[in-house]
Amino acid sequence: MKFFAVLALCIVGAIASPLTADEASLVQSSWKAVSHNEVEILAAVFAAYPDIQNKFSQFAGKDLASIKDTGAFATHATRIVSFLSEVIALSGNTSNAAAVNSLVSKLGDDHKARGVSAAQFGEFRTALVAYLQANVSWGDNVAAAWNKALDNTFAIVVPRL
């Protein structure tokens, strides 16, 4: 998986302060509301942070409008969202903590090999949260659940970069 498996950042981490069942439910339900918009999610990230787009050789240096409707873009966006969906589905159940940790650890290892920085993970987080805020019912409780999930994920990913 390429850089945008980074969407795993929107997921529940299985460390220090795992999500409660209620927090996981908020993350899962808000993700379910947008997870069918794979192309739009990836396009929003690329539009906000072109440096992330340039990490992908097949998309680097190209106008976003010219690639957004291509099969390659849709395929890649679907891979990312599917990965995210898998990890999000595992959230909120302590018996799944090892699986989440394994998936997110591999994400960090894979992205270290590609030269992805902690700052770029931060950019991705910012773009993803902005997309969610604009496209789901977003209150303080949803924001807190996503922030906790992302903080937990960063605690696993960043040391591996």
Swiss-Prot record:
Q: Where does heme b bind?
A: 76, 111
Which Pfam families is this protein grouped with?
Globin
User: What subunit structure does UniProt give?
Assistant: Homodimer.
- The organism encoding this protein is Chironomus thummi thummi
- Keyword Metal-binding recorded: yes
What keywords appear on the UniProt entry?
Answer: Heme, Iron, Metal-binding, Oxygen transport, Signal, Transport
List the top taxonomic levels of the source: Eukaryota, Metazoa, Ecdysozoa, Arthropoda, Hexapoda
Mind telling me what this protein is named?
A: Globin CTT-VIIB-5/CTT-VIIB-9
InterPro entries xref list:
Erythrocruorin, Globin, Globin-like_sf, Globin/Proto, Mb-like_M
Q: Name one GO molecular function term.
A: oxygen binding
